[in-house]
Amino acid sequence: MMRRAGSLLVALAVAAGVAGCAPRSSLEELPTGAASTAHEAIPLPPGALLDGAGKQPSMEFVPHGLDWEGSLRPRPSAPDDDPALEQIRERGRLIVGVEQSQYLLSYRDMVRGQLRGFEVELAREIARDLFDDPEAVDFRFVDSASRAELLREGRVDIVIRTMSITPERASKVAFSTPYLKSQVRVLAPIDRGIASMDDLPERTVCVVDRTTLLNIVRTLAPHSPVLRTRSWSDCLMATQQFQADAIIADDAILAGMLAQDPHTDILPDALATQYYAVGIPLEHDSVVRQVNATIERIRSDGTWHRMFQEWLSDSTTDPYPPPLMYREEPNEHE
C-alpha cells in the first residue's frame, strides 16, 4: 500500500486545489448535528444536493440476486455479425469511458502521469486481445449519470466504471459477463460513533447521485438525510469536513477511501450484492462477445487474480471472479 500512498498525496493535493477554486452556490442548510459549528460555513462539493430524510426510492430495491438474462458467449466473428467490432479494429484504438478519481479502481496517478487501477488494467487487457497492444486505448472520463448516454451516442466504445447490472440499465445498455462482485457496506469516520445501521437515523449519509446506490440508501436508511454528490471523492471530502457522517457504497469503492483516509472504518455487515460489468452499446453483439472472450481469458490465465492482488487484496471485495453469466441463445445446443 505504501507505493500507492505516495502518488495519492499528490492527487489529493491537486483535488484540494480544484475544490478550493470552485464557485460558491446557494446550498441547503445541513441538519442539526451533521456538522460542527466550525464546519458549517464550508460549502458542499460542487453540484452536491442535500435531501431531507424520508424521500422515497424511485424503484424497488432487491438486495441480493440478479434479474438479468445474461450476456452473449464468446465466439469467432461471423459474416452476418454487426460491424462494430471491425470498425474498432480498423480505427486501431479502443475508446473506453472510465473514472479518473476512484482510487484502486480507476484513478490518475499524478506522479506517474497515467491512469491506473483494476478497471484501467481490464481496459488494457481488452485492447491487448484486440490489437496485441495493451496501450492501444484512448480513455475518456465519464461520470455516473452520463455512462449510458455516451454509449448510445457512440462517443465511447465501452464503459468500465463500476457499472452494476440492473434490469433498468440492461434495457438501455448491453453488458458483458460480470468482472467483479461487490458488497454494499457502510464507511464512517471512526470518531462519529457509527457501529451499525442502527446508528444511522438522523445522521447524514453520502452517496453519488443517479446511481443504483441512491435507491439502496433511501430504502435502507429512510430516516437519514442524504447528501448526493457527483463523485465518491466528493463523498469522502464531505465526511472529512463533517458535512456527512457516513458513506454507503460498494466495498470495492470503499476500499479506495479506506486507503486514502485511515481515520475511517468499513462496517462488516453486507447490505446488498452488486455485479460490475462492461457497458457496451445495444446491438453491438460482436463487441460484447469480444469483451467476454477477454474476461474468460484473464480468468483462466491468472491475470484476473494478479490484478486483484495488486489492487484489491486489502479490501473486503470477493477475491474470486464472479460466475460467468450467459443467456441461452437460439441454436446453441444444435
What spans do the regions from the language model cover?
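Extracytoplasmic small-molecule ligand-binding "clamshell" domains
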Residues: 36-159
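Extended ligand-binding regions for polar small-molecule ligands
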Residues: 38-79, 211, 278-316
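Periplasmic-binding protein-like
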Residues: 40, 180-188, 255-293, 315-334
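Short loop->beta-strand "edge-of-pocket" segments that line small-molecule binding or catalytic clefts
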Residues: 94-98, 116, 197-213
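Beta->alpha turn/N-cap motifs
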Residues: 98-103, 140-145, 154-166, 190, ...
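C-terminal motif of bacterial Sec signal peptides marking the signal peptidase cleavage site
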Residues: 17-20
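A ligand-binding cleft/hinge motif common to bilobed small-molecule-binding domains
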Residues: 162-171, 240-273
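Acidic, polar ligand-binding/catalytic clefts
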Residues: 124, 128, 135-199
